[in-house]
Amino acid sequence: MNAQQPRAVRPAGLWPGAPGFHREVLRNPWYRLLGELQNSFNELTVEFWRRRGGQTLHLPITTGAVSSPIGLGSDSVPVRVDLGGAPTFLADSMQFTLELGCRMSRRACYYIMPSFRGEPSDETHLGQFFHSEAEIFGDLADVMRYVEDYLSYLAEQLLARHHSAVVNAAGDISHILALIGGDSFHSITFDEATELLDEGDIVDHGSWRTITRAGEQRLMQRVGSPLWLTHWDHLAVPFYQAFSLTGRSLNADLLLGPGEIVGCGERHIKAQDVRRALALHKVDPVPYEWYVDMREVDELQTSGFGLGVERFFMWMLRHDDIRDMQLVPREMGKQITP
């Protein structure tokens, strides 16, 4: 079915935690669909990695070594908490522990778990969201292929399981069918993107550049989507991404629907390269001494990715506000029940 259909199911838009929100969750079929998609997403992720020999890990949500610390290239603000009198952080990612898991198990490792960011929510960003993350053996090209296979598999299987409900919520499923049908994933370097975009789409910070959300949308319009945006300035990304031969970063963001839904990258192999990156990004090396030492013990080439689950659902349901992708809303700086 390619034609646009009326949207029979829509969210309430009652975030964050408006009085009676729990009643809306019980009444509105949007939230029932969301719960079903979440369940299927988890089941399908387990099956995807089972077929590829991957291993899941149960990891804590607190860490003393956030993957986006205060420093150049960090893409989020750490959430500091007090844990029995000890200052620590709610994890923005446990990617570093996935790297440890790869060395321990000699297998790809993955999880689906909450991610905490210290910024207010808006139309495309949640301060608390779910992250499907994995670390594999291989380089940047290898992990990009994993992501493409994973997204195509999720789209096909989720549509097969929930076809009628997805049509009722999205109104049009041509974008899903296109991805399932093998539409090519486009790819462009950050340097190439700057030649295609308008003034204001790229923000020049002096030693590094970033792209605006409007720039992401314009780039997809001009090049196509899904679109890989690769090889960013190294100071524009976190320190753990490996250096390319030209000094750029061996990383890639996948743009689809609301914008960036996947971030991935190749990791440093050698301890000396991690030390160099920490110094370049002006990050305190003390919490990451174990991360450096891990490479002294076992040098491996791994790469990893993180998929924002709610952003993926935004794309699938053709929705324009990620805050409607929460069964139980959360907002930075607010006490919300349930």
Residue ranges and their predicted role:
Residues 1-137:
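Class II aminoacyl-tRNA synthetase-like tRNA-binding/catalytic domains
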Residues 28-32, 99, 110, 160-163, ...:
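Short, structured coil/loop segments at alpha-helix boundaries
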Residues 42, 46, 50, 148-155, ...:
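Generic solvent-exposed, charged/amphipathic alpha-helical segments
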Residues 50-55, 156, 160-164, 202-203, ...:
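Intrinsically disordered or highly flexible coil/loop and linker segments, enriched in small
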Residues 66, 151, 164, 326-329:
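Flexible domain-boundary/linker segments
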Residues 73-145, 182-338:
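A translation/RNA-centric and nucleic-acid-associated enzymatic feature enriched
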Residues 140-161:
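Internal alpha/beta scaffold segment
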Residues 160-189, 196:
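Long, charge-rich alpha-helical interaction segments
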